[in-house]
Regions:
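Alpha/beta enzyme core
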Residues: 1-72, 86-97, 102, 108, ...
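Generic enzyme active-site microenvironment
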Residues: 7-9, 77, 142
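Glycine-rich beta-to-alpha transition loops that act as phosphate-gripper elements at the mouths
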Residues: 75-84
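Hydrophobic alpha-helical scaffolding
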Residues: 82, 100, 104, 125-132
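Extended, intrinsically disordered, low-complexity segments
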Residues: 115-152
Length: 152
């Protein structure tokens, strides 16, 4: 415990291509894991997966509440946040999620803009302007969704 934050993960956050969505984090196991490891945040499996979904996932909001309570209000992390409907993200945050990973959506925001950006220059600072703006705009929307704009 050298003052370094450590995020643990309990349960398996699979990939959407594997359709692995059933190994949810057990509340009692989460409580024990946190006590034994001293992690500063815990990534939990509550219905998400990495990648793009074929249909929107349904988060187990009650499980989030239960894990949050059992772990002494430890910050909880949601992996696989890309593609989760905004209302479910809001509910997850209200239940105890404190960090959400949106990596797939960030990649697609960037790549989608690269695909439509006119290639009239080889100057990277010009070519990358719109893809970078797409990422910025996406991040701003998620910062607002999570309520983080009220604490910045």
């Amino acid at each position: 415990y050298a003052g370094v934050p450590v995020e643990g993960e309990l349960g398996h956050v699979g990939a959407t291509k594997d359709e692995v969505l059933g190994n949810y984090t057990d509340v009692a196991e989460a409580e024990r894991f946190v006590k034994e490891t001293g992690v500063s945040a815990l990534a939990v499996m509550v219905g998400t997966a990495h990648g793009r979904y074929k249909k929107a996932p349904v988060l187990d909001i009650q499980r989030i509440r239960d894990i949050r309570e059992a772990t002494g209000k430890l910050p909880l992390v949601l992996h696989g946040g890309s593609g989760v409907p905004d209302e479910q993200i809001r509910m997850a945050v209200e239940a105890g999620i404190r960090k959400v990973n949106f990596a797939t959506d960030l990649c697609y925001a960037f790549l989608d803009q690269v695909m439509v950006t006119e290639r009239t220059t080889v100057a990277l600072d010009v070519f990358m302007r719109e893809p970078i703006h797409a990422i910025r705009d996406y991040c701003i929307s998620k910062i607002r969704l999570l309520g983080a704009d009220r604490i910045l």
